[in-house]
Amino acid sequence: MGGEVVTAPVPEFSSPALIPYPSKVVRGKGGVRFKSVHVHLDRDVPRRDDLVREMKDVFGMFGIPASVSKDVFEEGSLTWELSLDAGIEGEAYILSVAPEKATVRAGSFGGFFNALQTLRQLVSKGKGGFFMPSVQISDEPAFALRGMMLDVGRYYMSPAFIKELMRRVSRYKINTLHLHLTDDPAWRLEVKKFPALTDRVFHWKSRLPGKFYTQEQLKELVDYCAGLNIQVIPEIDMPGHSQAFRKALNVKMSDEKATKALVALIKEMCSLVPKEKMPIIHIGTDEAHGKDE
């Protein structure tokens, strides 16, 4: 069933709250009432499979029947068209809902992903089906890095929990996960060269000793987050907050042995994921007072 043009406000549908609020929003009169959607992606849209999956998730959360085609339009549905615009930089996008069709233009995967999260907030559901207001949105992030830090060094969180949390915060355009993997209570990442680091014997008994992430789990998390436009920044904290490291390897942070071990394990971590997927590794550097804790 096709979209129905609505030229006046519809009482049963609430006005959408957009979080974070876009850079520029021009609201028209009325909007479009519809019962299904069809999505068309231009051939040059980047990471099409990821965007198709995200589109299905957006409409699926409302129970909206959606068909997706990479090449052809279908009759009888409100059409969403995604097209690449090289003139739109970074994670910016332009989203338009008009009577004839709805469109998204962006110059990158991040721009398209952000637009879909705004689209997610534009949809209303009522007795008459689904509704989107007539609107023109031009948006770009105020901050290039919009992050969340999880202190799993002190408080272990399961991979499933982290993935679900990232799924939720991605809807608000968070694009960075800072993963604090090590601290005094525990070392949470598998290091094949130094297996003692994840041994429960060297972890605090009160902080889920022996719980850690395998290298495969880190790879899976990086890939999963990439599909949500989130970059993972793993952190190995040093020289402060290094009790678990010092106990497991029986070293002081000022020892040459400790330095060599840190270099080796950082190299091992860097080899796990291609640089383009995980370009940054955080090494803490807090409390560098020249003293051993």
Listing of model-derived features with the role each one plays in the protein:
Residues P11, I88-E293:
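Feature activates predominantly on carbohydrate-active enzymes
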Residues M1-A144:
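Acidic, contiguous N-terminal accessory segments
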